[in-house]
Amino acid sequence: MAPARAGCCPLLLLLLLLLGLWVAEVLVSAKPKDMTSSQWFKTQHVQPGPQACNSAISNINKYTERCKDLNTFLHEPFSSVAITCQTPNIACKNSCKNCHQSHGPMSLTMGELTSGKYPNCRYKEKHLNTPYMVACDPPQQGDPGYPLVPVHLDKVV
């Protein structure tokens, strides 16, 4: 019996693993093609008046056709979140320097998946009053005319 060749298999396995991770990331963060990153941020995270998480996140899940594990809603208008982009730059979780922290505690709701398969996703709500961090980028065509617009909710502080 010939010895197994070690040259190609580890490389092939690594490539398959990387492809799998890339596909998983695309599915998790996929934004609709007809939306800018800022518009998708607004759809997912801006909710001036609190609503029940089960129905609110259901509207987001329709775009991705899967149950989102966790979603946070900021209870303030988009214009207020965009003003957060004018605070000093700080490092994001991914080490990029385009994050900004809200001026103070803000009302928000976190919805965490507890059970279900799409489209019957069920969420547990947690209401908080705490600062948040957003990643901001220059606006794209179709975005409001702010110097920077929020494109990613980086974390709740």
UniProtKB/Swiss-Prot annotation:
GO BP terms: namely: defense response to fungus; defense response to Gram-negative bacterium; defense response to Gram-positive bacterium; innate immune response
Tell me where in or outside the cell this protein is found.
Secreted
Top EC class for this record: hydrolase
* UniProt-listed SUPFAM superfamilies: RNase A-like
Q: Which PROSITE patterns match?
A: RNASE_PANCREATIC (PS00127)
Residues of the signal sequence? Answer: 1-30
Q: Which Gene3D superfamilies match?
A: Ribonuclease A-like domain (3.10.130.10)
Keyword annotations: Disulfide bond, Endonuclease, Hydrolase, Nuclease, Secreted, Signal
- Coiled-coil segments, which residues? none
**Family assignment?**
Belongs to the pancreatic ribonuclease family.
Q: What does this protein do?
A: Has a low ribonuclease activity.
Quote the protein name from its UniProt record: Ribonuclease 8
Q: Which gene encodes it?
A: RNASE8
